[in-house]
């Protein structure tokens, strides 16, 4: 092939009509062309399919490696992203679980507090249920005490009323037949002076039925001014004070001459 190229170059040079006096220049040009052809032949020899495949394999390998690296990087990034998403999901799930536990804890605490409240309410109801019974017992006790006091008061009043009735009966009832013959004489007198002397009406009166001997004294300025004594049907004993005047009334019965001065 080299020879063919040289022959073509020679023919090309002869066709151009090179002068026969320049064979050396022609040879130099042929040598240069030969070197160029050699370089081109080396280049063409490099263009062998196996070499070309080798040359192409290197970029393909690099591309494959780069693609593999990029795919690995993408897959690793995808895996990292999925792992991160999984961790995020698991974190959310764990947080939800924790929140669920927290909610369940709160629910349990609320349930416990409700049970505690219900227990306190039950105990309060029990205590309040016992308290009315105690209060009822205490109320029964004061009522009993009050009834005892009332009964005591009533009994005392009844005794005092019976005593008064007895006294009144003794005062109001006539003397028995045995003492009927015994008359009670009351001294009568009126308008007595300071010397306790009767001015008039001095005498004796005999009590009858419920009559009593009565003695009435009137004092003015601390001195006895007027005095009356006799028999009276109604004779309450009393002391009256009015404007410096004092009136004293004394009554007696079943005693002869009880109002005698």
From Swiss-Prot:
PTM text: The N-terminus is blocked.
Disordered: annotated span: 50-176
CDD domains with a match to the protein in the record: TFP_LU_ECD_SP10_like (cd23628)
One Pfam family, short name: UPAR_LY6
Bias (Basic and acidic residues) ranges: 75-128
Any one cellular-component term (Gene Ontology): acrosomal vesicle
Tissue expression: Testis.
Signal peptide region: 1-17
Start-end of Low complexity biased regions: 129-147
UniProt entry tagged with the keyword Signal: yes
Keywords linked to the UniProt accession: Repeat, Signal
InterPro entries in the cross-refs: Acrosomal_SP-10-like, LY6_UPA_recep-like
Protein name per its UniProtKB record: Acrosomal protein SP-10
Organism expressing this protein natively: Mus musculus (Mouse)
């Amino acid at each position: 092939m080299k020879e063919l190229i040289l022959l073509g170059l020679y023919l090309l040079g002869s066709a151009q009509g090179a002068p026969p006096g320049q064979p050396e220049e022609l040879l130099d040009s042929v040598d240069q062309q030969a070197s160029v052809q050699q370089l081109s032949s080396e280049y063409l020899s490099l263009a062998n399919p196996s070499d070309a495949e080798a040359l192409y394999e290197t970029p393909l390998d690099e591309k494959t490696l780069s693609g593999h690296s990029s795919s690995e990087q993408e897959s690793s990034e995808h895996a990292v992203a999925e792992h991160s998403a999984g961790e995020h999901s698991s974190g959310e799930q764990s947080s939800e679980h924790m929140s669920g536990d927290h909610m369940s804890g709160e629910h349990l605490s609320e349930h416990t507090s409700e049970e505690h409240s219900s227990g306190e309410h039950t105990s309060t109801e029990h205590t309040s249920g016992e308290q009315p019974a105690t209060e009822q017992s205490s109320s029964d006790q004061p009522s009993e005490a009050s009834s005892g006091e009332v009964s005591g008061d009533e009994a005392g009043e009844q005794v005092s009323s019976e005593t008064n009735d007895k006294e009144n009966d003794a005062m109001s009832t006539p003397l028995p037949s045995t003492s009927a013959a015994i008359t009670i004489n009351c001294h009568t007198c009126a308008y007595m002076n300071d010397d306790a002397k009767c001015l008039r009406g001095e005498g004796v009166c005999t009590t009858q039925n419920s009559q009593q001997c009565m003695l009435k004294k009137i004092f003015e300025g601390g001195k006895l001014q007027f005095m009356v004594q006799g028999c009276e049907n109604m004779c309450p004993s009393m002391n009256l004070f009015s404007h410096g005047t004092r009136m004293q009334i004394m009554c007696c019965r079943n005693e002869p001459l009880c109002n005698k001065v």
